[in-house]
């Protein structure tokens, strides 16, 4: 679905702090925006304190880097309805909208209201241990992964949807992905590509032993539970962030978040398939 445009009086610019190019590009964008809007702020994408200070009331947040910078921004703006515009300085950039060179001549047009809002579902996850919630509030735009803790070994899990078992797996891991995440980790293990604005969830096993490797597509309102078998050790990874250790009997619950990511798009909706085709080398530029 397409959401309404947000107030453009306050705009933020973030950048990947380990990239000198991203820092320079963000500074140039910030300088260009200053005479155009009431307030513009600049921060490292890793500076959580700056985001907490500035994000309220921000209408647009430009991210300079790659998809990882966009993923971090999508989590950082929760619970505020901030629209994201990704400036691609990375490699593939499924989530980014345009290059720095393409952005600069269009900044005034963007501030003036050009484009449309694309709304994308996010995931929320929690950890249950001995029947008690031990960690909640994980949010992911791409995916939640329950994986093996040790290279060379598998992890044995039971996967349930809405409390009904759908499979026992001994595998490298289980990916629960959004439509956005369908072009990320799950794609690399043979999962399908979903339209970015669909709300379905994907469950995809990673290298399952003596079990089907097919993905399962679930309605957006589904609850997914992944339980670690007794005597097993695993990890929880949310959008590729630092892992959390899991042990036998631990359960990871995943559902669609009440928060959604908003992206500013300047091309028609069909551009998604063109972008995917080109970045996966299915189409020539």
Regions found by a protein language model. Give the residues of each.
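ATP/NTP phosphate-donor binding region
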Residues: 1-60, 64, 101-116, 127-138
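Short, well-ordered beta-strand core segments
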Residues: 61, 84, 174-175
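Gly/Ser-rich helix-loop-strand patches that form or flank binding pockets
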Residues: 72, 76-87
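Short glycine/serine/threonine-rich phosphate/pyrophosphate-binding segments
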Residues: 22, 68-73, 182-188
């Amino acid at each position: 679905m397409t959401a309404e445009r947000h107030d453009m009086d306050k705009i933020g610019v973030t950048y990947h702090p380990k990239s000198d190019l991203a820092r320079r590009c963000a500074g140039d964008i910030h300088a260009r925006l200053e005479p155009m809007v009431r307030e513009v702020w600049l921060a490292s994408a890793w500076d959580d304190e700056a985001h907490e200070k500035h994000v309220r009331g921000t209408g647009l947040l430009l991210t300079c880097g790659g998809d990882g910078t966009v993923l971090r921004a999508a989590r950082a703006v929760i619970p505020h309805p901030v629209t994201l515009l990704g400036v691609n300085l990375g490699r593939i950039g499924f989530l980014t909208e345009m290059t720095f060179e393409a952005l600069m001549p269009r900044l005034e047009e963007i501030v003036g209201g050009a484009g449309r809002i694309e709304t994308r579902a996010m995931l929320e996850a929690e950890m249950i241990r001995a029947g008690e919630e031990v960690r909640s509030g994980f949010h992911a735009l791409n995916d939640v992964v329950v994986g093996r803790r040790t290279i060379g070994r598998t992890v044995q899990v039971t996967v349930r949807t809405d409390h009904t078992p759908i499979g026992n797996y001994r595998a490298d891991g289980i990916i629960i992905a959004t439509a956005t995440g369908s072009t990320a980790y799950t794609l690399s293990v043979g999962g399908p590509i979903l339209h970015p604005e669909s709300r379905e969830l994907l469950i995809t096993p990673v290298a399952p032993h003596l079990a089907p490797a097919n993905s399962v597509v679930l309605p957006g309102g589904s609850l997914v539970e992944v339980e670690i078998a007794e005597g097993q050790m695993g990890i929880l990874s949310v959008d590729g962030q630092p892992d959390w250790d899991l042990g036998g009997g631990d359960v990871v619950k995943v559902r669609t978040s009440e928060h959604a990511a908003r992206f500013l798009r300047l091309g028609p909706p069909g551009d998604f398939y063109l972008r995917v085709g080109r970045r996966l080398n299915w189409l020539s530029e």
